[in-house]
Amino acid sequence: EELSYAAGADKVFRYGEGLAEQVRRYNSDKGVDVVYDGVGKATFQESLEAVRPRGTVALFGAASGPVEPIDPQLLNKHGSIFLTRPSIGAWTAQEGEFQMRAQAVVQAVMDGDLRFNVTASYPLAEAAAAHRDLQDRKTTGSIVLRVQDADGDED
């Protein structure tokens, strides 16, 4: 929760059963404008229930597994909500898009508008452990794989 508040969140909700109810209780049963769901299968239904009518659910990950295919009428049932599944390939498919978007990210970092919260660092030789920690949700923020150790030696 601390990381979320430090990043500017007004309110933090822990995902799981009852998440949509917590969200709606917090904002007078209106739902939220946008839900960014990086968990996937385990949270998708709650994400649909937490968003306001005509709101957007952006499904950008599948940490708990892929979301099952859905009937489009489900979006209507929840108030004509919009569902998107953005991917880097779709946003960089046209010539020059990757460079333009990469340049925008670098500029945002240089301007201080985009910051990284590196919470763990692993030598490259421990990449499998880093991957396990990600899968087991033992990490928050960003992790770094080091190609060289502090002495400049390659791992």
Name each region found by the language model.
Residues 20, 45, 73, 125-128:
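Residues in well-ordered alpha-helical elements
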Residues 33-36, 56-59, 116-119:
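Short catalytic-loop micro-motif centered on adjacent basic/acidic residues
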Residues 42-113, 147-155:
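Glycine-rich phosphate-binding loop and adjacent beta-alpha segment
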Residues 4, 35, 47, 105, ...:
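Terminal peptide-recognition signature
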Residues 29, 113-120, 128-155:
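C-terminal capping/lid region of NAD(P)-dependent oxidoreductase domains
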Residues 1-43:
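Adenosine-nucleotide cofactor-binding segment
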